[in-house]
C-alpha cells in the first residue's frame, strides 16, 4: 500500500513537471511567434526617436523635443506630416498572414521597395525595427516584416485604406514645418514692418515697461502725435500667433534674382528670449512673373493682381506664401492712431 502511494505521488509529480515544461515551451513559442506580429507601439509617449531609411539612400531622423519633433537635427518637423506618421506607428495591425504562394512576391517587394523603420525610447534603446514595403493588389494592405524575422505579413490601419508607406516616404523639405511666425502676444518684444516704397507707413512696435510704443521705422518720417487706438497693438500682435507658408521653394531657379529685388515688405519679429525672425516678401503677379518697373521700382498692378508672395525666411529658406494669409500683417504706421476727423 505504501509502495503504491509512493508511485502514485511520483507519477503525479512527474506529470505535473512534464505539463509545466510543455506549458513553458508553448508559452515561449507563442511569445516568439507574437513578437514578429506586434508592429504597433501603443503608447507613442515611449517613442523619442524615429529613424527611416529607404533604398534610395534617403535617411531621416525625427527626434522628440518639448512640444515638437526635430527633423535631421536641424529643423522643426511639420505637424501635419508627423500626425499621420505617429498615428500609423500606434495603430498598425496585422490584417492577415499571406498564403505560402504569395511569400516570394512579398519578400521581393520588401527587398526592392522596403522602408526600414527604427523606433527608440528616451534612453536610446531600440523598441522596434521593421520594414514597410509594397501594397496588395487592392491597395488595402501593406507588406511588412519585423527586422530579423522570416515571416512577412499584410498590415493595415483600421478605418483607413492605402499603402502605409505614404506616411513614411517623405523627402527633404517635405518633412519641414512651413511656419513663418508663431509667437504668443505676451512673448513678443518687438515687431518692425518696413515698406521700402511706402516709408511713411513703416514702423516699429515695441513692448516697453510703460506699455507698447509705436514709432516710425525711418528717422525722416514725422511722428504722429494723435492718441493711440485702444487695444490696437494687441490686435496687431495677435496676428503673429500662427502664420504659415504654402510650400518651400528652395530649389526655385529664380531665387537668387528675386532676392536681389527690392521687397514689398520686410517684417522682423524679436521675442522675449531675443530670437529674431525676419521675412522679406516679394509679390508674384499672375503668371509667376515679378512685375517691377526698372526706373521707378514700383510693382505693376499690385493692388489687384497679387495673390502670392515669395517669402525669404531669415535669409536661409525660400517659400511660397498666400496673400490671404499674410494680409492681416500688413498694417501701416497710421493704423495705430485715432482718426484725425474723429478728434474734431
Regions inferred by a protein language model and the residue ranges of each:
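Soluble, acidic/polar mature domains that operate outside membranes
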Residues: 1-344
Amino acid at each position: 500500500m505504501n509502495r503504491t502511494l509512493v508511485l502514485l505521488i511520483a507519477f503525479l509529480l512527474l506529470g505535473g513537471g512534464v505539463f509545466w515544461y510543455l506549458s513553458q515551451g508553448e508559452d515561449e513559442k507563442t511569445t516568439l511567434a507574437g513578437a514578429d506580429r506586434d508592429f504597433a507601439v501603443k503608447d507613442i509617449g515611449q517613442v523619442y526617436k524615429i529613424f527611416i531609411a529607404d533604398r534610395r539612400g534617403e535617411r531621416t531622423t525625427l527626434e522628440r523635443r518639448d512640444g515638437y519633433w526635430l527633423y535631421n537635427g536641424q529643423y522643426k518637423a511639420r505637424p501635419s506630416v508627423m500626425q499621420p506618421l505617429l498615428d500609423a506607428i500606434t495603430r498598425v495591425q496585422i490584417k492577415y498572414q499571406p498564403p505560402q504562394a504569395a511569400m516570394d512576391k512579398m519578400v521581393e517587394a520588401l527587398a526592392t521597395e522596403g522602408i526600414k523603420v527604427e523606433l527608440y525610447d528616451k534612453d536610446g534603446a531600440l523598441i522596434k525595427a521593421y520594414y514597410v514595403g509594397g501594397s496588395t493588389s487592392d491597395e488595402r494592405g501593406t507588406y511588412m516584416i519585423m527586422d530579423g524575422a522570416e515571416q512577412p505579413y499584410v498590415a493595415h490601419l483600421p478605418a483607413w485604406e492605402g499603402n502605409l508607406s505614404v506616411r513614411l516616404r517623405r523627402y527633404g523639405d517635405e518633412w519641414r514645418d512651413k511656419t513663418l511666425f508663431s509667437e504668443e502676444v505676451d512673448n513678443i518684444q518687438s515687431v518692425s514692418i518696413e515698406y521700402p516704397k511706402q516709408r511713411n507707413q513703416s514702423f516699429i512696435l515695441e513692448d516697453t515697461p510703460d506699455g507698447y510704443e509705436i514709432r516710425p521705422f525711418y528717422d525722416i518720417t514725422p511722428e504722429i502725435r494723435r492718441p493711440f487706438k485702444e487695444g490696437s497693438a494687441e490686435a496687431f500682435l495677435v496676428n503673429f500667433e500662427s502664420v504659415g507658408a504654402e510650400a518651400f521653394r528652395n530649389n526655385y531657379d529664380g531665387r537668387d534674382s528675386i532676392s536681389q529685388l527690392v521687397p514689398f515688405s520686410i517684417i522682423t519679429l524679436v521675442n522675449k528670449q531675443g530670437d529674431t525672425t525676419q521675412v522679406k516678401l516679394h509679390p508674384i503677379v499672375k503668371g509667376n512673373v515679378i512685375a517691377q518697373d526698372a526706373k521707378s521700382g514700383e510693382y505693376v498692378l499690385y493692388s489687384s493682381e497679387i495673390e502670392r508672395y515669395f517669402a525669404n525666411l531669415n535669409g536661409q529658406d525660400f517659400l511660397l506664401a498666400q496673400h490671404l494669409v499674410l494680409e492681416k500683417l500688413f498694417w501701416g504706421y497710421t493704423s495705430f492712431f485715432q482718426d484725425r476727423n474723429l478728434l474734431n
